[in-house]
């Protein structure tokens, strides 16, 4: 347990930031799942719209240090490739 007031404040801030980061991380995962769901349904237009929203949220996560840039780029690239391959598979 923290004894100094500054350590107590730091502990409070850590809890607060952790909750905010978890919320943002969960939101990113939700938007990725929406894209994957649209891909599985075969709706290319909806998948593209969902991807643009997800891409925005992912890059916001990078800006806020929720995920790393390379991880974000990899996720966006893989989702884009899946959408582009929808025409080829039919």
Curated annotation (Swiss-Prot):
SUPFAM superfamilies: Ribosomal protein S20. One of its GO terms (biological process) is translation. Disulfide bonds: none annotated. Pfam families: Ribosomal_S20p. The keyword RNA-binding applies. Keywords: Ribonucleoprotein, Ribosomal protein, RNA-binding, rRNA-binding. InterPro entries: Ribosomal_bS20, Ribosomal_bS20_sf. Gene3D superfamilies: Ribosomal protein S20. GO terms for cellular component: small ribosomal subunit. GO terms for molecular function: small ribosomal subunit rRNA binding; structural constituent of ribosome. Binds directly to 16S ribosomal RNA. Belongs to the bacterial ribosomal protein bS20 family. This is Small ribosomal subunit protein bS20. It comes from Rickettsia canadensis (strain McKiel). The gene is rpsT.
């Amino acid at each position: 347990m923290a004894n100094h007031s500054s350590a107590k404040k730091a502990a409070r801030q850590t809890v607060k930031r952790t909750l905010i980061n978890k919320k943002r991380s969960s939101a990113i995962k939700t938007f990725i799942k929406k894209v994957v769901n649209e891909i599985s349904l075969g709706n290319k237009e909806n998948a593209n719209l969902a991807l643009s929203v997800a891409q925005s949220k992912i890059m916001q996560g990078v800006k806020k240090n929720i995920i790393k840039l390379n991880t974000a780029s990899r996720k966006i690239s893989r989702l884009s490739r899946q959408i582009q391959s929808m025409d080829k598979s039919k």
